[in-house]
Amino acid sequence: MADRMTQLQDMINEMASLMTNAIGVLQATAPPCEFDAISQDHEEEPNCAIFAASIAKSAKNIEILIDSFPIEAGNMEDEVEQKMIQNDAVQREKVGELKELVGESTQLVSAVQKKLSEISRVQMSSRPSE
């Protein structure tokens, strides 16, 4: 995938270079003209056709490379949604387990408090009275 991304970046850089060169060459070699008139000289300009063909070929190569990338956008959303549903189910299960543990610990605390109470009563009753 990284190779394709590098290749895509190289192709985009090449296309930008072609466009920049085309503008520079056409600007330097094109004779002045009016915007509303089409001149025969401009239609016969060989550089225009060469640069147009090069840019079109570069654009087509970029399109072909982009089409070769794996499409995962829709699948990723489905996978994320399924994972969230699974996480919610696990969370509910863990919350239930936690509530059970809290209940058990509350019972154990009560039992320990009762035993401590009994121990203190026994100790108080076993002391000699003064």
UniProtKB/Swiss-Prot annotation:
It comes from the Eukaryota. InterPro entries: Med7/Med21-like, Mediator_Med21. One of its GO terms (biological process) is regulation of transcription by RNA polymerase II. One of its GO terms (cellular component) is mediator complex. Gene3D superfamilies: Mediator complex, subunit Med21. It is found in: Nucleus. Belongs to the Mediator complex subunit 21 family. Component of the Mediator complex. This is Mediator of RNA polymerase II transcription subunit 21. It comes from Caenorhabditis briggsae. The gene is mdt-21.
